[in-house]
């Protein structure tokens, strides 16, 4: 599927002329295709067949609320690197329980908030980070769901 095309030398996004969008919204502007996002996500999802999986969109790639909302409605998970990104996912209709918290600079406050909201798991990248997550979880009398991120080139 290609939702961007030319018709009589005019560029179209789905069935709308890009020049019409420029008149209405000004230029420059970003144009996203709902149909293309849905098509791409579904192809990726279907490639896993019956294997259990969670597709996590990297919010740092594009945190546009409209894009996040489309993905949330599809049941997507999200890869976040800050509480701000988690709050954007929630504002867009995403579920904290489908969010993986990555990144090496998680603060104790962020860890606590993520645990309160019930994230899917923390991607832990160092022993010091594991200690920090464990410490916060103990103070909250809970267990922190984790996965260990390994980079063999380091």
Predicted features, each with a name:
Residues 1-145:
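A charged N-terminal "starter" segment
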Residues 145-154:
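Flexible glycine-/small-residue-enriched beta->alpha junction loops
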């Amino acid at each position: 599927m290609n939702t961007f095309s030319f018709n009589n030398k005019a560029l179209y996004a789905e069935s709308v002329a890009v020049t019409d969008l420029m008149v209405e919204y000004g230029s420059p502007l970003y144009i996203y295709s709902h149909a293309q996002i849905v098509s791409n996500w579904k192809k990726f999802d279907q490639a896993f067949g019956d294997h259990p999986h969670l597709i996590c969109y990297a919010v740092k790639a594009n945190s546009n609320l409209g894009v996040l909302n489309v993905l949330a409605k599809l049941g997507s998970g999200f890869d976040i690197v800050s509480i701000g990104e988690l709050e954007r996912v929630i504002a867009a209709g995403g579920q904290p329980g489908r969010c993986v918290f990555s990144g090496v600079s998680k603060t104790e406050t962020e860890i606590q908030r993520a645990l309160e909201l019930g994230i899917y798991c923390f991607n832990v990248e160092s022993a010091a980070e594991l200690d920090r997550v464990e410490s916060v979880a103990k103070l909250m009398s809970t267990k922190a769901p984790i996965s260990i991120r390994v980079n063999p080139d380091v």
